[in-house]
Protein backbone atom coordinates (compact mmCIF):
# COMPACT_ATOMS: atom_id res chain seq x y z
CA UNK A 1 0.00 0.00 0.00
CA UNK A 2 1.38 3.39 -1.00
CA UNK A 3 1.51 6.33 1.41
CA UNK A 4 0.21 9.74 0.23
CA UNK A 5 0.69 13.09 2.01
CA UNK A 6 -1.78 15.91 1.31
CA UNK A 7 0.03 19.15 2.16
CA UNK A 8 -2.27 22.18 2.62
CA UNK A 9 -1.63 25.91 2.72
CA UNK A 10 -3.22 27.69 5.75
CA UNK A 11 -5.65 29.58 3.48
CA UNK A 12 -7.13 26.31 2.19
CA UNK A 13 -8.71 25.53 5.55
CA UNK A 14 -11.54 27.97 4.84
CA UNK A 15 -12.30 26.34 1.47
CA UNK A 16 -13.57 22.83 2.17
CA UNK A 17 -14.58 22.26 -1.44
CA UNK A 18 -10.99 22.69 -2.61
CA UNK A 19 -9.73 20.18 -0.05
CA UNK A 20 -12.41 17.63 -0.98
CA UNK A 21 -11.59 18.06 -4.66
CA UNK A 22 -7.91 17.38 -3.98
CA UNK A 23 -8.74 14.29 -1.92
CA UNK A 24 -11.03 12.87 -4.61
CA UNK A 25 -8.36 13.43 -7.26
CA UNK A 26 -5.74 11.59 -5.19
CA UNK A 27 -8.18 8.76 -4.43
CA UNK A 28 -8.81 8.28 -8.14
CA UNK A 29 -5.10 8.29 -8.95
CA UNK A 30 -4.09 6.11 -5.97
CA UNK A 31 -7.15 3.97 -5.13
CA UNK A 32 -5.51 1.79 -2.45
CA UNK A 33 -3.31 4.45 -0.87
CA UNK A 34 -3.28 5.62 2.74
CA UNK A 35 -3.87 9.40 2.85
CA UNK A 36 -2.26 11.67 5.48
CA UNK A 37 -3.14 15.37 5.75
CA UNK A 38 -0.99 18.17 7.25
CA UNK A 39 -0.69 21.97 7.05
CA UNK A 40 2.65 23.26 5.77
CA UNK A 41 3.01 25.83 8.59
CA UNK A 42 3.03 23.10 11.22
CA UNK A 43 5.83 21.33 9.36
CA UNK A 44 7.80 24.56 8.94
CA UNK A 45 7.51 25.35 12.69
CA UNK A 46 8.54 21.78 13.69
CA UNK A 47 5.14 21.18 15.29
CA UNK A 48 4.78 18.06 13.12
CA UNK A 49 7.71 15.75 12.36
CA UNK A 50 7.43 13.77 9.13
CA UNK A 51 8.81 10.20 9.12
CA UNK A 52 11.89 9.60 7.03
CA UNK A 53 11.49 7.82 3.65
CA UNK A 54 7.81 7.12 4.31
CA UNK A 55 5.66 8.72 1.59
CA UNK A 56 5.41 7.66 -2.04
CA UNK A 57 3.72 10.86 -3.19
CA UNK A 58 3.17 14.36 -1.75
CA UNK A 59 0.53 16.71 -3.16
CA UNK A 60 0.62 20.44 -2.24
CA UNK A 61 -2.52 22.62 -2.45
CA UNK A 62 -2.07 26.41 -2.40
CA UNK A 63 -4.82 28.67 -3.85
CA UNK A 64 -2.65 31.81 -3.46
CA UNK A 65 -1.15 31.85 -6.95
CA UNK A 66 0.75 35.09 -6.33
CA UNK A 67 2.78 33.60 -3.46
CA UNK A 68 3.75 29.98 -4.13
CA UNK A 69 7.28 30.05 -2.69
CA UNK A 70 8.36 27.25 -0.32
CA UNK A 71 11.21 27.81 2.20
CA UNK A 72 14.34 25.71 1.48
CA UNK A 73 14.17 24.24 5.00
CA UNK A 74 10.69 22.84 4.25
CA UNK A 75 11.98 21.45 0.94
CA UNK A 76 14.67 19.53 2.82
CA UNK A 77 12.07 18.03 5.21
CA UNK A 78 9.81 16.98 2.33
CA UNK A 79 12.77 15.45 0.48
CA UNK A 80 13.71 13.40 3.55
CA UNK A 81 10.13 12.15 4.01
CA UNK A 82 9.85 10.86 0.41
CA UNK A 83 10.89 7.40 -0.65
CA UNK A 84 13.44 6.93 -3.41
CA UNK A 85 11.64 7.66 -6.66
CA UNK A 86 8.81 9.55 -4.89
CA UNK A 87 7.21 12.66 -6.36
CA UNK A 88 6.02 16.05 -5.10
CA UNK A 89 3.25 17.64 -7.19
CA UNK A 90 0.60 20.34 -6.92
CA UNK A 91 0.86 24.13 -6.69
CA UNK A 92 4.65 24.38 -6.79
CA UNK A 93 6.70 27.55 -7.44
CA UNK A 94 8.27 28.04 -10.86
CA UNK A 95 11.07 30.43 -9.80
CA UNK A 96 12.86 28.29 -7.19
CA UNK A 97 14.61 25.78 -9.45
CA UNK A 98 17.98 26.49 -7.83
CA UNK A 99 16.65 25.78 -4.31
CA UNK A 100 14.92 22.65 -5.61
CA UNK A 101 18.13 21.29 -7.14
CA UNK A 102 20.18 22.21 -4.06
CA UNK A 103 17.86 20.10 -1.89
CA UNK A 104 18.22 17.02 -4.13
CA UNK A 105 15.04 17.15 -6.21
CA UNK A 106 14.84 16.82 -9.99
CA UNK A 107 12.40 19.08 -11.84
CA UNK A 108 10.36 17.15 -14.41
CA UNK A 109 8.85 18.48 -17.62
CA UNK A 110 5.36 18.65 -16.09
CA UNK A 111 6.62 20.86 -13.23
CA UNK A 112 6.59 18.17 -10.52
CA UNK A 113 9.61 17.34 -8.34
CA UNK A 114 10.97 13.83 -7.94
CA UNK A 115 13.43 12.27 -5.53
CA UNK A 116 15.93 10.30 -7.62
CA UNK A 117 16.85 6.78 -6.62
CA UNK A 118 20.51 6.23 -5.68
CA UNK A 119 22.69 5.06 -8.54
CA UNK A 120 25.31 2.41 -7.91
CA UNK A 121 28.76 3.48 -8.94
CA UNK A 122 30.73 1.42 -11.43
CA UNK A 123 34.47 1.25 -11.04
CA UNK A 124 36.42 1.40 -14.27
CA UNK A 125 39.31 -1.02 -14.17
CA UNK A 126 42.60 -0.03 -15.56
CA UNK A 127 43.22 -1.51 -18.96
CA UNK A 128 46.40 -3.50 -19.04
CA UNK A 129 48.55 -3.33 -22.13
CA UNK A 130 48.86 -6.47 -24.23
CA UNK A 131 51.69 -8.65 -23.01
CA UNK A 132 54.55 -8.92 -25.40
CA UNK A 133 57.68 -10.88 -25.40
CA UNK A 134 59.94 -10.28 -22.46
CA UNK A 135 62.20 -7.40 -23.14
CA UNK A 136 65.85 -7.98 -22.72
CA UNK A 137 68.00 -5.66 -20.77
CA UNK A 138 70.20 -3.47 -22.92
CA UNK A 139 73.72 -4.77 -23.38
CA UNK A 140 76.71 -2.61 -23.37
CA UNK A 141 79.88 -3.34 -25.20
CA UNK A 142 82.86 -3.14 -22.97
CA UNK A 143 85.93 -1.90 -24.77
CA UNK A 144 88.74 -4.45 -24.71
CA UNK A 145 91.97 -3.08 -23.39
CA UNK A 146 94.83 -3.72 -25.72
CA UNK A 147 98.46 -2.86 -25.50
CA UNK A 148 99.50 0.39 -26.88
CA UNK A 149 100.88 -0.07 -30.32
CA UNK A 150 102.03 2.22 -32.99
CA UNK A 151 99.36 2.81 -35.58
CA UNK A 152 99.27 4.51 -38.88
CA UNK A 153 97.56 7.89 -38.57
CA UNK A 154 96.49 7.69 -42.15
CA UNK A 155 94.22 4.70 -41.40
CA UNK A 156 90.52 5.11 -40.47
CA UNK A 157 89.61 5.56 -36.72
CA UNK A 158 87.52 2.44 -35.88
CA UNK A 159 87.04 3.36 -32.17
CA UNK A 160 84.97 6.41 -33.04
CA UNK A 161 82.74 4.32 -35.29
CA UNK A 162 82.18 1.78 -32.50
CA UNK A 163 81.20 4.50 -30.02
CA UNK A 164 78.72 5.97 -32.50
CA UNK A 165 77.05 2.62 -33.14
CA UNK A 166 76.78 1.93 -29.40
CA UNK A 167 75.11 5.33 -28.82
CA UNK A 168 72.57 4.59 -31.53
CA UNK A 169 71.72 1.25 -29.94
CA UNK A 170 71.18 2.88 -26.54
CA UNK A 171 68.88 5.52 -28.03
CA UNK A 172 66.80 2.92 -29.84
CA UNK A 173 66.51 0.86 -26.62
CA UNK A 174 65.29 3.87 -24.61
CA UNK A 175 62.75 4.80 -27.27
CA UNK A 176 61.37 1.28 -27.31
CA UNK A 177 61.06 1.20 -23.51
CA UNK A 178 59.28 4.54 -23.15
CA UNK A 179 57.03 3.94 -26.16
CA UNK A 180 55.64 0.80 -24.48
CA UNK A 181 54.83 2.70 -21.27
CA UNK A 182 53.18 5.58 -23.10
CA UNK A 183 50.87 3.18 -24.92
CA UNK A 184 49.72 1.82 -21.57
CA UNK A 185 49.07 5.33 -20.23
CA UNK A 186 46.99 6.22 -23.26
CA UNK A 187 44.80 3.21 -22.56
CA UNK A 188 44.13 4.53 -19.01
CA UNK A 189 42.73 7.87 -20.25
CA UNK A 190 38.91 8.12 -20.29
CA UNK A 191 36.98 10.68 -22.30
CA UNK A 192 34.73 12.68 -19.92
CA UNK A 193 32.14 13.34 -22.61
CA UNK A 194 31.51 9.59 -23.01
CA UNK A 195 30.33 9.38 -19.38
CA UNK A 196 27.46 11.87 -20.00
CA UNK A 197 24.28 10.53 -21.54
CA UNK A 198 22.88 12.30 -24.58
CA UNK A 199 19.62 13.01 -22.74
CA UNK A 200 21.47 15.01 -20.08
CA UNK A 201 23.43 17.19 -22.46
CA UNK A 202 22.38 20.81 -22.83
CA UNK A 203 19.43 20.25 -20.47
CA UNK A 204 20.12 23.17 -18.15
CA UNK A 205 17.32 25.21 -16.57
CA UNK A 206 18.26 28.88 -16.41
CA UNK A 207 17.30 30.30 -13.03
CA UNK A 208 16.41 34.00 -13.10
CA UNK A 209 16.99 35.79 -9.74
CA UNK A 210 13.84 37.04 -8.05
CA UNK A 211 13.21 40.76 -7.88
CA UNK A 212 13.42 42.44 -4.50
CA UNK A 213 9.70 43.14 -4.25
CA UNK A 214 6.75 41.59 -2.43
CA UNK A 215 3.31 40.80 -3.89
CA UNK A 216 -0.05 42.28 -2.86
CA UNK A 217 1.44 45.76 -2.49
CA UNK A 218 3.32 44.93 0.72
CA UNK A 219 6.09 47.19 1.96
CA UNK A 220 9.46 46.41 0.44
CA UNK A 221 12.27 45.39 2.76
CA UNK A 222 15.38 47.52 3.12
CA UNK A 223 18.48 46.73 1.11
CA UNK A 224 21.16 44.49 2.62
CA UNK A 225 24.53 45.86 3.69
CA UNK A 226 26.26 44.22 0.72
CA UNK A 227 23.30 44.47 -1.70
CA UNK A 228 24.07 43.37 -5.26
CA UNK A 229 20.56 43.26 -6.74
CA UNK A 230 20.27 47.02 -7.32
CA UNK A 231 17.85 47.70 -4.44
CA UNK A 232 20.36 49.90 -2.61
CA UNK A 233 20.82 52.16 -5.65
CA UNK A 234 17.04 52.35 -6.07
CA UNK A 235 16.60 53.47 -2.46
CA UNK A 236 19.32 56.11 -2.87
CA UNK A 237 17.56 57.48 -5.95
CA UNK A 238 14.25 57.67 -4.06
CA UNK A 239 15.90 59.45 -1.11
CA UNK A 240 17.60 61.93 -3.44
CA UNK A 241 14.28 62.64 -5.19
CA UNK A 242 12.60 63.22 -1.81
CA UNK A 243 15.37 65.62 -0.73
CA UNK A 244 15.12 67.55 -3.99
CA UNK A 245 11.35 67.88 -3.55
CA UNK A 246 11.76 69.08 0.04
CA UNK A 247 14.43 71.62 -0.96
CA UNK A 248 12.15 72.94 -3.70
CA UNK A 249 9.19 73.31 -1.33
CA UNK A 250 11.30 74.99 1.35
CA UNK A 251 12.77 77.39 -1.21
CA UNK A 252 9.31 78.34 -2.44
CA UNK A 253 8.06 78.83 1.13
CA UNK A 254 11.05 81.04 2.02
CA UNK A 255 10.58 83.07 -1.14
CA UNK A 256 6.85 83.59 -0.48
CA UNK A 257 7.56 84.56 3.15
CA UNK A 258 10.12 87.13 2.01
CA UNK A 259 7.70 88.62 -0.49
CA UNK A 260 4.95 88.78 2.14
CA UNK A 261 7.27 90.55 4.60
CA UNK A 262 8.21 93.10 1.93
CA UNK A 263 4.53 93.76 1.21
CA UNK A 264 3.74 94.23 4.92
CA UNK A 265 6.67 96.63 5.32
CA UNK A 266 5.51 98.66 2.33
CA UNK A 267 1.98 98.75 3.74
CA UNK A 268 3.26 100.03 7.07
CA UNK A 269 5.27 102.74 5.38
CA UNK A 270 2.21 103.92 3.50
CA UNK A 271 -0.01 103.98 6.62
CA UNK A 272 2.57 105.55 8.95
CA UNK A 273 1.02 107.83 11.62
CA UNK A 274 2.51 111.31 11.87
CA UNK A 275 1.84 113.42 15.02
CA UNK A 276 1.73 117.17 14.84
CA UNK A 277 3.19 119.49 17.46
CA UNK A 278 -0.30 120.28 18.70
CA UNK A 279 -1.01 116.57 19.19
CA UNK A 280 2.19 116.07 21.08
CA UNK A 281 1.62 118.98 23.44
CA UNK A 282 -1.75 117.60 24.40
CA UNK A 283 -0.09 115.05 26.64
CA UNK A 284 2.91 117.18 27.57
CA UNK A 285 2.33 118.16 31.21
CA UNK A 286 5.22 120.61 31.19
CA UNK A 287 3.03 123.04 29.25
CA UNK A 288 0.80 125.15 31.48
CA UNK A 289 -2.87 124.74 30.87
CA UNK A 290 -2.54 121.29 29.19
CA UNK A 291 -4.00 118.17 30.73
CA UNK A 292 -4.04 114.54 29.73
CA UNK A 293 -6.82 112.75 27.98
CA UNK A 294 -8.31 111.76 31.32
CA UNK A 295 -7.56 115.17 32.88
CA UNK A 296 -6.44 113.45 36.08
CA UNK A 297 -2.77 112.53 35.56
CA UNK A 298 -1.60 115.20 38.03
CA UNK A 299 -3.92 114.01 40.81
CA UNK A 300 -2.02 110.80 41.59
CA UNK A 301 -2.10 107.05 40.93
CA UNK A 302 -5.65 106.72 42.21
CA UNK A 303 -6.89 108.86 39.31
CA UNK A 304 -4.50 107.73 36.56
CA UNK A 305 -5.20 105.26 33.72
CA UNK A 306 -3.54 101.83 33.45
CA UNK A 307 -1.21 103.01 30.69
CA UNK A 308 -0.33 106.39 32.18
CA UNK A 309 3.40 107.16 31.96
CA UNK A 310 3.25 108.86 35.40
CA UNK A 311 2.25 105.74 37.33
CA UNK A 312 4.24 105.57 40.54
CA UNK A 313 4.95 109.30 40.73
CA UNK A 314 3.37 111.53 43.39
CA UNK A 315 0.76 114.16 42.47
CA UNK A 316 2.03 117.33 40.87
CA UNK A 317 0.66 120.62 39.66
CA UNK A 318 -0.21 121.07 35.96
CA UNK A 319 2.58 122.91 34.21
CA UNK A 320 5.20 121.79 36.74
CA UNK A 321 8.35 120.16 35.35
CA UNK A 322 8.54 116.68 36.82
CA UNK A 323 12.08 115.46 37.63
CA UNK A 324 13.46 112.79 39.91
CA UNK A 325 15.36 115.41 41.90
CA UNK A 326 12.14 116.98 43.02
CA UNK A 327 11.15 113.73 44.70
CA UNK A 328 14.51 113.03 46.28
CA UNK A 329 13.32 114.21 49.67
CA UNK A 330 10.38 111.82 49.64
CA UNK A 331 12.49 108.75 48.87
From Swiss-Prot:
Region (Fe-S binding site A) location: 212-229
Region (Linker): 147-202
Feature: compositional bias, Polar residues: 146-158
CC cofactor: [2Fe-2S] cluster; [4Fe-4S] cluster
Motif extent (Cx2C motif 2): 305-308
Stretches for region Disordered: 142-164
Span(s) of short sequence motif Cx2C motif 1: 294-297
Subcellular location: Cytoplasm; Mitochondrion intermembrane space
GO cellular component: cytosolic [4Fe-4S] assembly targeting complex; mitochondrial intermembrane space
TM regions (residue ranges): none
N-terminal SAM-like domain: annotated span: 1-146
Region (Fe-S binding site B): 294-308
UniProt GO BP: cellular response to oxidative stress; iron-sulfur cluster assembly; negative regulation of hydrogen peroxide-mediated programmed cell death; negative regulation of nitric oxide biosynthetic process
Keywords for this protein: 2Fe-2S, 4Fe-4S, Cytoplasm, Iron, Iron-sulfur, Metal-binding, Mitochondrion
Subunit structure: Monomer. Interacts with TAH18. Interacts with MIA40.
Protein family per UniProt: Belongs to the anamorsin family.
Function as written in the Swiss-Prot or TrEMBL entry: Component of the cytosolic iron-sulfur (Fe-S) protein assembly (CIA) machinery required for the maturation of extramitochondrial Fe-S proteins. Part of an electron transfer chain functioning in an early step of cytosolic Fe-S biogenesis, facilitating the de novo assembly of a [4Fe-4S] cluster on the scaffold complex CFD1-NBP35. Electrons are transferred to DRE2 from NADPH via the FAD- and FMN-containing protein TAH18.
Name of this chain's protein: Fe-S cluster assembly protein DRE2
Species assigned in the record: Clavispora lusitaniae (strain ATCC 42720) (Yeast)
